[in-house]
Amino acid sequence: MNKDAYIQMFKDTNALLEGHFLLSSGKHSAKYLQCAKVLQYPNLAEMICSDLAQHFKDQQIDVVIGPALGAVTLSYELARQLNCRSIFAEREDGIMKLRRGFKIEEGEKVLVVEDVITTGGSVREIIEIVKEYRGEVVAVAGIVDRSGGKVDLGYPLKTLLTLEIETFEPEECPLCREGIPIVKPGSRKK
């Protein structure tokens, strides 16, 4: 699928929201991409992950890992298509870690996934977990890079959509100055 088809998919599933949003990064934005609204449809999740899997099918990935909650479905479906394990990290006392008996064996090839990448903060936390377990990060994959291609994670990044969606520091946010109420739609509690 091409970029326009993916954007239309987000519109058709009401996953492209407009308003005043507090992002997981702490920044503010007038647009928010709620990938869960797309991924709730198994056929769309399969299609998205099939397109992503094409880029990694020859890399012998052992594990796909992403942060809970946003990347759990993405990680699972991508791992299913790559015929490997899927695990996720989650926050405990504000720190991202592996729980539920999940682990990464030394030397395992790991694909890190996130639904939407803005600053890459959650992805960097996952990369650190992989390094702690002595796994090998092969690449990072996502549905949307909303940094416009500016985020550098130190590993190859493959997303289906690269968009430049303006974000604001809270103290510089024009939406705050206009008094527009802010909404925090994501899963991370700050």
From Swiss-Prot:
Catalyzed chemical reaction(s): orotidine 5'-phosphate + diphosphate = orotate + 5-phospho-alpha-D-ribose 1-diphosphate
Spans through the membrane: none
Top-tier EC class: transferase
Source domain of life: Bacteria
Pfam family, one: Pribosyltran
The entry's keywords: Glycosyltransferase, Magnesium, Pyrimidine biosynthesis, Transferase
Protein name per the record: Orotate phosphoribosyltransferase
Species assigned in the record: Caldicellulosiruptor bescii (strain ATCC BAA-1888 / DSM 6725 / KCTC 15123 / Z-1320) (Anaerocellum thermophilum)
Gene coding for it: pyrE
